């Protein structure tokens, strides 16, 4: 991915746009979007919660970023979950990825 942004506000707008893709498909869960960016706000990975019971936005974005997530920033429209349900906690994936900072 080569897209980049000028501010975290712009990155968050992108995450909100991604979240909208899940509206009507993830209930009763919230629609969530996530973007992984480097220090220059270049997009390394994106994701959204696309289906009830499926991977959450954070996991999708981290998988898209792969090893580039280490040391990067995760911008997400809702705080990462930390409970066990149909999917494992997103906080575990965030910690395992080496993300340096989370912006909500």
How should each PLM-predicted stretch be described?
Residues 5-27:
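Short, basic/aromatic recognition patches
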Residues 36-104:
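Zn2+-dependent cytidine deaminase-like catalytic core
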């Amino acid at each position: 991915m080569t897209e980049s942004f000028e501010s975290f506000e712009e990155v968050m707008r992108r995450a909100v746009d991604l979240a909208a893709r899940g509206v009507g498909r993830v209930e009763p869960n919230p629609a969530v979007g996530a973007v992984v960016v480097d220090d220059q706000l270049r997009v390394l990975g994106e994701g959204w919660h696309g289906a009830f019971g499926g991977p959450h936005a954070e996991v999708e974005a981290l998988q898209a970023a792969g090893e580039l997530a280490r040391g990067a920033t995760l911008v997400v429209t809702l705080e990462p979950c930390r409970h066990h349900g149909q999917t494992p906690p997103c906080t575990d994936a965030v910690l395992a990825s080496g993300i340096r900072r989370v912006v909500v």
